Curated annotation (Swiss-Prot):
A motif (DWD box 1) lies at residues 1237-1245. SMART domains: LisH (SM00667). Belongs to the VPRBP/DCAF1 family. It comes from Caenorhabditis elegans. This is DDB1- and CUL4-associated factor homolog 1. Residues 224-245, 888-906 have a biased composition (Polar residues). A motif (DWD box 2) lies at residues 1275-1282. The lineage of its organism: Eukaryota, Metazoa, Ecdysozoa, Nematoda, Chromadorea. WD repeats lie at residues 1086-1125, 1128-1169, 1171-1210, 1215-1252. Component of the cul4-rbx1-ddb1-dcaf1 E3 ubiquitin-protein ligase complex. One of its GO terms (cellular component) is nucleus. Signal peptide: none annotated. Residues 1390-1423, 1451-1461, 1494-1512, 1520-1543, 1667-1678 have a biased composition (Acidic residues).
Length: 1701
């Protein structure tokens, strides 16, 4: 045997690929079985059929296959189907063939085994069923018929007369009792049969001894020349007497004549390598001649019966009979109610005989006895008796290489679970304990899979005993345990090997056992280290930590350390801090690191996700134990660096921190305990206990003070700090801040959310020790917006209030670390907000100084009031006090800190007192806080209270500052008293207080007075002028001293008169005003393809638009015409960037190669260069000579002219994997930002900074045009200091761009253009932000998802690409995007609002304004008719009318929105006039015009004047209604006739000038006629009747409009069912506008009447002019409402010529 053992990879299968000879033999057996079953199927229904011969032959074949199966040494404890464990074995395939024949199996159980009066048939049936036991399901086979199991009890008990049938019944009952339901059901039968079985074993043992005496001792030296049919052994058999008295012997078949497999194959079995050990030959005396067989080729044939064994079922041998009884007893052994029968039957004595292989002479008999012993060892009483009677030495006598060793190690595994038994074992002699550990370790390496698993589980429990643990290390146990898992095929990175479900299952069982054992191993060593620390340091650890109360003394070697598991986490923390602080080693953890266990445990976590068909509980337990073991290894700081190393798992590389963070974030199917375990590993790497942190900071400061400038060697504590900074940095690189913040905010799972939140907060506290992390956290909403305080209000789960209290404690500590000061919680009731905490800190750290003379003046005044004039006069003369307040006098001393009293020693603290230890200090703070619910005071003296930057937690202490123990100062100051005085008993009311010092002096009282006064300031500051006792203190208010007016017009006029800083403020205010106003100007959707990208040309005259098909179009901004296009790519364009001089242009596409290209602009686009793999290319900012391209995580800089690669910047493993990574130059082209990394263009080897990723979905970063900031998602960083300046949640997932000055930023959340679905729930918008403080200016609400946004270079217009609902027809789908051009700096008018509402209500985009201008005939036909026009009017106006009373007056007409009504009407009027001109220009013949108005006039009325003018046809229904209203009001309400009504001045008021008529597209001649006719008649009317007529007209008109609306709504609802709410909103607006308009007409009519009564009759032209002026004043009053459709006076003028005719 070689000195170095080779451990082949294991797939947990014990049988390799069988040879051709074995395969041929297996095939013959299966064919023979198939023939016999066919013969049975053909004859079993005949009355003369005798099943016994067929049963015998099938049984013989099965027994032969079983012997072949046994010779291959399968796992004896693996009770799975042979076909599952060994798919190529003959036994498994034969069993499958038999079980498929349901008729045969039914006959076998029902007819043959239970046959009456046919013992031979019962025997052969039971024999066959016993041979089928390895593949049977006991729940199914033994469930029916009901009398099956009772018949077996009858045969097996004392009533049975046939021994063979009795033995077979025992074997079948053993299989039946594997089902616990049967065991409980037949409890009484078992109580009778167990004693009988034990007595039967005594009898059979005696018979076996007699048979052995007859045979004599076997001499192995004679076995060379012998060849027996039993493969080298003689087994005593029982003569079975049949019914006819003849003796039945075993019949030989053709199968038995085949030669056994060649021994060379068997010699390659793993157990053969250990057969050469001399210790084994010396163990068993009968094996003394084994060494003579070393050179024999037949060695395995000789040794097989003694190491593996075999069995003879028919004729039933004595050994097999005893085995069946032992198997039955093993099935009953674990039941407590049968333990009494076991003791009464003296089972222990029987077992001692059977486990001695020298006595049993059968290894399988010994193995079955060990199985019975294992079932009895679950009882503590039996286990104690077994060990006390020498059971351990008896077990160790079983040869390791034999089959029975599996049973031995299983017994030891059961013993390990009993503490009392293990204590006895550990107190045995060293030889026995040593041999036990060696025996189990040998089985761990060389046994079957079940034996290895039992050995592993023995150590998982036994390693808590120091006696076992010490020997486990001594005999190289960790390495052997590592080999146990490392040799598994499952743990290899080999995807070519496919494992079966059975192999995966058994491999995962092995992995779980190893992880559990290693966890116990390191836990025990940590407990031992804690005990050693307690011996060495007592109760005072150098780190300031305390020992758990449970760990008080040294645990003996024979006692278990398992009770320490309750304080395991505290012990781990102590060991971690001590190893970090002292720099000592952890040898056991270091050895595991050398073995590669860090990678192995991480592999368990990573690879377990791909292991299918294993239970979630098994996967969780396995991974939790692996990560908990890993966490214990991280107690040694040097091992923590292993998490930085990249490891390969299934062709993917991961570092440890990534694995742990992803696990802690968790998936929906992962257990919370697994997330907690992963989070605990991260916490171990980044967290430092507060006590240890203080000690480290003190040592660092002292070492820096002692170190000389010449000494360059780092101190031990500097190395500690460097290691911590490295860990903090690595966690940040793997998105640690984002992950921890998300875990703190998580609320699922409900039961464990509080625990996860607590651990995450503790981990974030450790990470916040890093100053950059602290600065980032201070800007995040968790801290800045009091998110953490909100979480502290109540627990997630109401049953976890104790855990929530621990979380609140951790949260307070986190706030203290971030703020750098003590945070008190007002007796735990309410944690202060960040603003209040900062305010309090300012007040506490304000240096209080006051005038000493003023204090003496107050004392002087008090003496005068107390009638002590002489004392007051003496004080005034001695102190030279002025007559006025000293603060108003000069040359008065200022007291910067309290002065000591000359008469009392207690007013000054003795600095020679020793400073309190940190723990004593905390107890002092806790006591004061408990008595006084206030927030801080100095513990040392009033002088120390003025030192502002000294806190209790030296989180941010620098090495140059001395150590100060202070608190924050809101509670009254308490003098620092020596430890001896602290023990004094408090005074009682009756005791004298002359010997005690007062708590405060006068200076402290005055200081507190001033500090309380300072706390009332609105904006307190730390640096204040001297306080005065006579005048109220007040900090200066924040003032914005500027004379800039708010009015933008006045501000523009005064621009030249402003001061420089006022001009800056004015410019800032102007930009805020301009970029907070936007107005829709034009909408374009003239192309069939979708728009994907847009940008303005250099001169802002054209819009360069990219389409989905890869075309680039040049659209004129003013006209909206497409002036040219070029096909640039084969897929959607994702980026278009023209150069600054307009000579070149870069384009990028989605997926077609080349992805990007450079174009030269001229008369046509000319492609210059292509960039095949770069998904985005951009020009440099200061020059056109360089281009940066992005290919995944690589940024490449090209030369523009030559297209040569200048530099390449690869982010690699440090990249943050942005969702859209587009590299870009900084404004000065000195920096490049790519995938979260900032590069210096002069140094491409390493990035200068890696930004933290704080959001799961992050777009590319954008440099600020000023060159000092960069915007990454919702964070704004200063690229000079890399500090986070702002956190703007509104910028999350937004694409940002800047205006020309860089002072304004646009942001919008873009939608993926490749997504074909239109989500109506997505309503996108863009916002504008001011880049000074990134406050939002305005939000331009959009009703559709935004794909892209761009702004012109002159900041006049913007272009937004919106995704609209696609319109489908029979043959095509219209464009699903549109271009919306927005004007900057202009308010949105009502027409824009109506357009948006109209677009939402209709589904057909052909009705839009730009489509109508195209002159499509279909559009003319659709909109030309009266019915369609009338429908459009009411749809636009929201269906005029209101369900409320139309006659109700409007209280405040100034609040009405007049523009909606006017613009909606004028827009329709203009469109109809435009169509009229188009029809007139297209043809001279009116009859040939398409879309005639007459054909579409639904009301049947001809157009007025017969001209077919559509300007008024659209309101025909409203005209008729208004006419009826006029007549009804005149005749009924006012009592006048119709003629007067037609010629009334209020109706024909001349308030519409020629411009308004031209606005409605009337001919000038018609307008002039209308005006002249309107001036002919002006009858006078009283004022009151006119106002009454107006009120009546409003009421009747409102009712009529409602009726008209209700009549039309039914037809419109079918087209506009989704827009009813918008229509109702417009109803109210339209009604209010109508009322206002009618009242304006009444006021105009009244003014005209009064003018005529005054006698002022001028000419028609002058009257027209004056009337026009009047109307202009009225127009201002009613907000320019000039709607023709609702102007009854104007309609009267147009109809009057027809009436007169």
């Amino acid at each position: 045997m070689t000195s170095k053992e080779i451990y082949p990879l294991r797939s947990t299968g014990t049988m390799m690929m069988i040879s051709d000879q074995d395969l041929k033999l297996s095939t013959q057996l299966m064919l023979r079985i198939a023939e016999l079953l066919l013969e049975f199927d053909a004859n079993h229904e005949q009355s003369s059929f005798d099943p016994i011969p067929i049963l015998k032959r099938i049984s013989e074949l099965l027994e032969q296959a079983t012997d072949i199966f046994i010779k291959n040494d399968p796992d004896p404890l693996d009770d799975r189907h042979p076909h599952r464990t060994h798919p190529d074995s003959a036994l498994g395939n034969i069993l499958k063939i038999i079980f498929k024949n349901d008729d045969f199996m039914t006959k076998l159980v029902v007819s043959y085994i239970l046959a009456r009066d046919n013992v031979e048939l019962n025997i052969q049936g039971s024999r066959l069923l016993l041979a089928c036991i390895p593949g049977l399901d006991s729940k199914v086979v033994f469930s029916e018929p009901d009398d099956f199991i009772p018949r077996l009890y009858t045969w097996a008990g004392s009533e049975g007369t046939n021994e063979t049938l009795q033995g077979y019944a025992m074997g079948l009952l053993a299989a039946a009792l594997e089902n616990t339901e049967n065991a409980s059901k037949y409890r009484n039968e078992n109580a009778l049969l167990v004693p009988f079985g034990l007595r039967r074993l005594h009898e059979l043992q005696g018979r076996s001894l007699e048979e052995q005496k007859k045979i004599g001792q076997t001499d192995f030296s004679q076995l060379h020349a012998e060849q027996s049919t039993s493969n080298g052994t003689s087994i005593p058999s029982i003569k079975i007497t049949s019914v006819d008295g003849s003796t039945k012997e075993n019949e030989k078949t053709f199968v038995q004549s085949t030669d056994p497999p060649p021994p060379k194959k068997r010699r390659t079995e793993p157990c053969l390598t250990s057969l050469l050990r001399t210790e084994i030959t010396q163990r068993v005396p009968s094996f003394h001649n084994l060494r003579n067989l070393d050179d024999s080729n037949s060695k395995w044939d000789i040794l097989q019966p003694f190491l593996i064994g075999d069995q003879q079922v028919y004729p039933l041998s004595l050994a097999t009979y005893q085995r069946f009884i032992l198997q039955y007893l093993a099935a009953c052994g674990e039941y407590q109610d049968l333990l009494l029968q076991t003791f009464e039957g003296n089972a222990l004595e029987i077992l001692f005989d059977y486990i001695d292989l020298e006595k049993s002479k059968d290894v399988r008999l010994t193995f079955d006895a060990l199985k019975y012993l294992t079932s009895l060892l679950v009882h503590r009483k039996f286990a104690l008796e077994f060990v006390n009677k020498g059971g351990i030495p008896a077990l160790l006598k079983v040869p390791k290489t034999s089959l029975a060793s599996v049973g031995v190690v299983t017994c030891l595994y059961y013993i390990a679970y009993s503490n009392d038994v293990m204590e006895i074992l550990c107190q045995m002699s060293d030889e026995i304990v040593d041999e036990t550990v060696q025996y189990v370790l040998w089985c761990l390496e060389h046994s079957h899979e079940s034996g290895m698993a039992s050995a592993c589980m023995f150590f998982s429990q036994g390693l808590f005993y120091k006696a076992i643990l010490r020997r486990f290390d001594q005999y190289d146990g960790p390495r052997k345990l590592h080999n146990y898992i490392a040799t598994l095929t499952l743990m290899q990175n080999n995807e070519d090997v496919e494992l079966t479900e059975e192999q995966i299952h058994t491999s995962t069982q092995c992995t779980r056992g190893v992880c559990t054992t290693f966890r116990s191993y390191l836990t025990a060593h940590i407990f031992i280290k804690v005990e050693n620390y307690k011996k060495l340091y007592g109760n005072n650890l150098p780190t300031g930590m305390r020992f758990p109360e449970l760990v008080q003394g040294d645990c003996p070697d024979y006692k278990s350390m398992k009770p320490y598991e309750e304080v395991c986490w505290q012990c781990e923390a102590i060991v971690t801090e001590m190893l970090r602080f002292t720099g000592s080693s952890f040898r056991e953890a270091e050895n595991l690191r050398k073995l590669g266990m860090v990678r192995m445990f991480l592999a368990v976590r990573v690879l377990s996700r791909d292991w299918e068909n294993i239970s979630p509980s098994l996967r969780t337990e396995m991974c939790v134990h692996a990560l908990e073991t890993l966490c214990m290894m991280f107690c040694l700081p040097s091992i923590q660096t292993e998490l930085i190393t990249q490891h390969s798992y299934n062709h993917s590389n991961y570092d440890g921190f990534t694995i742990l963070l992803q696990t802690s974030l968790g998936r929906y199917d992962e257990d919370p305990s697994l997330r907690m375990a992963a989070l605990g590993c991260i916490q171990r790497c980044v967290y430092v206990e507060p006590e240890c942190w203080k000690a480290i900071i003190q040592r660092v400061k002292s070492s820096e003070e002692k170190s000389s400038s010449a000494s360059k060697r780092q101190s031990k504590y500097e190395i500690i700090m460097n290691h911590l900074e490295r860990m903090w940095t690595e966690v940040r690189k793997t998105d640690g801040i984002m992950a921890l913040v998300n875990l703190i905010n998580c609320k699922i799972p409900l039961t464990e959310a509080d625990s996860i939140r607590k651990t995450a907060t503790n981990t974030l506290t450790g990470l916040a020790r890093h100053p950059e992390v602290r600065q980032i956290l201070a800007k995040l909403p968790l801290i800045a917006h009091n998110g953490l305080q909100n979480l502290m209000r109540e627990p997630v789960c109401s049953d976890k209030r104790d855990i929530h209290a621990a979380f609140c404690k951790e949260a307070v500590q986190l706030l203290q670390v971030i703020y750098g000061r003590k945070i008190h919680d007002q007796q735990g009731k309410e944690i202060q907000s960040s603003e209040k905490s900062h305010r309090q800190w300012v007040i506490e750290n304000t240096q209080v100084s006051f005038n000493q003379a003023e204090l003496l003046q107050l004392i002087h005044d008090h003496l005068l009031k107390s009638k002590l004039d002489s004392v007051a006069a003496m004080l005034k003369s001695e102190a030279k006090l002025p007559d006025r307040p000293a603060s108003r006098s000069i040359n008065t001393p200022i007291l910067n800190k309290p002065l000591p009293s000359s008469g009392n020693n207690f007013s000054k603290i003795n600095d020679t007192y020793p400073t309190l230890a940190p723990r004593t200090l905390e107890s002092e703070i806790g006591g004061i806080s408990a008595r006084r619910p206030s927030n801080a005071a100095s513990l040392s003296s009033p002088a120390m209270a003025t030192r502002s930057h000294s806190t209790d937690d030296d989180v941010f202490a620098t090495p140059t500052l001395p150590r100060r123990y202070t608190t924050s100062g809101a509670f009254p100051k308490k003098l620092m008293i020596s430890p001896a005085r602290q023990k004094l008993r408090p005074l009682t009311p009756g005791e004298s207080s002359s010997g005690y010092r007062p708590i405060k002096d006068l200076n402290s009282i005055v200081t507190d007075y001033f500090r309380n006064q300072h706390s009332t300031c609105k904006n307190p500051v730390t640096t204040c002028p001297p306080f005065s006792l006579f005048y109220q203190h007040k900090c200066p208010e924040l003032s914005y001293q500027t004379n800039v007016v708010r009015n933008i017009s006045l501000r523009t006029l005064d621009q030249e008169l402003l001061r420089p800083h006022e001009r800056v403020y004015s410019q800032w205010t102007n930009e805020r005003t301009i970029f907070s106003r936007f107005r829709n100007w034009k909408t374009i959707h003239d192309h069939d393809e979708s728009y994907t990208k847009a940008t303005f040309s250099v001169d802002d005259e054209h819009l360069i638009v990219g389409l989905f098909n890869g075309e680039v179009h040049w659209i004129n901004v003013d006209t909206g015409l497409d002036e040219g296009h070029t096909n640039c790519h084969g897929s959607a364009l994702t980026n278009i960037e023209p150069s600054k001089d307009g000579s070149m242009m870069l384009t990028s596409s989605a997926f077609s190669r080349p992805l990007s290209a450079l174009w030269r602009l001229g008369e046509a686009l000319q492609r210059v260069h292509t960039y095949r793999e770069d998904s985005c290319v951009k020009f440099a900012n200061t020059t056109m000579q360089r281009i940066v391209g992005t290919c995944r995580d690589k940024a490449t800089v090209y030369d523009t002219e030559t297209n040569h690669v200048l530099d390449t910047y690869l982010s690699g493993i440090d990249g943050l994997q942005y969702e859209k990574n587009y590299a870009s130059f900084s404004p000065d082209d000195k920096l490049i930002f790519n995938d979260g990394l900032l590069w210096d263009v002069r140094k491409k080897n390493s990035a200068i900074h890696v930004f933290d990723r704080l959001s799961k979905i992050t777009l590319f970063g954008t440099f600020h045009p000023h060159g000092t900031q960069i915007v990454i998602n919702s964070e704004v960083y200063d690229i000079r200091t890399f500090r986070m300046l702002h956190h703007v949640p509104e910028l999350n997932r937004c694409q940002v761009s800047f205006n020309s000055t860089g002072n304004i930023m646009y942001a919008t959340e873009v939608t993926d253009v490749h997504c074909p679905d239109y989500d109506e729930k997505i309503f996108s918008s863009f916002r504008t932000f001011e880049t000074r403080d990134y406050s939002a200016l305005t939000t331009f609400e959009g009703r559709r998802p935004v794909i892209d946004l761009c702004a012109s270079h002159q900041d006049q217009k913007m272009c937004v690409i919106e995704k609209v609902r696609p319109q489908m027809s029979d043959y095509m789908i219209q464009a699903s995007t549109q271009l919306k051009i927005v004007e900057i700096g202009r308010l949105k008018d009502n027409e824009d609002e109506n357009d948006e509402e109209e677009d939402e209500q209709r589904e057909d985009h052909d009705e839009d304004e730009d489509s109508d201008e195209s002159g499509d005939g279909d559009d003319d036909e659709e909109i030309g008719g009266n019915s369609s026009d009338r429908e459009s009017v009411f749809r636009t106006l929201g269906r005029l009318g209101d369900e409320s009373d139309s006659g109700s007056s409007v209280d405040d007409n100034d609040t009405l929105d007049d523009l909606d009504f006017e613009n909606a009407q004028n827009r329709i009027i203009r469109r109809q006039a435009q169509r009229r001109r188009q029809r007139l220009n297209s043809s001279e013949n009116d009859a040939e015009l398409p879309g005639s108005d007459e054909g579409s006039d639904e009301d049947g009325d001809d157009d007025e004047d017969g001209e077919g003018d559509p300007d008024f046809d659209m309101g025909a229904a409203i005209d008729d209604l208004v006419d009826a209203v006029d007549e009804e009001v005149d005749e009924d309400e006012l009592g006048t006739d119709g003629d007067d009504d037609d010629s009334g001045s209020w109706r024909t008021t001349n308030s519409i000038d020629s411009e308004d008529i031209n606005l409605d597209d009337l001919d000038e001649e018609e307008a002039r006629v209308v005006e002249n006719e309107g001036n002919n008649e002006r009858p006078a009317r009283p004022v009151d009747p006119i106002e009454a007529a107006a009120a009546a007209r409003r009421a009747i008109l409102g009712r009529g409009l409602r009726d008209l609306r209700m009549g039309i709504r039914g037809g419109n609802r079918r087209r506009n069912g989704g827009g009813l709410e918008q229509a109702e909103m417009l109803n109210a607006r339209a009604e209010e506008q109508r009322v206002s308009f009618m009242e304006a007409l009444v006021r105009g009519a009244e003014a005209e009447r009064r003018e005529e009564e005054g006698g002022d009759d001028g000419e028609s032209s002058s009257s027209s002019s004056s009337d026009t002026d009047e109307y202009q004043s009225e127009e201002e009053e009613i907000n320019s409402v000039s709607t023709t459709a609702l102007n009854p006076a104007l309609r009267r003028r147009n109809r009057r010529p027809d009436d007169e005719a």
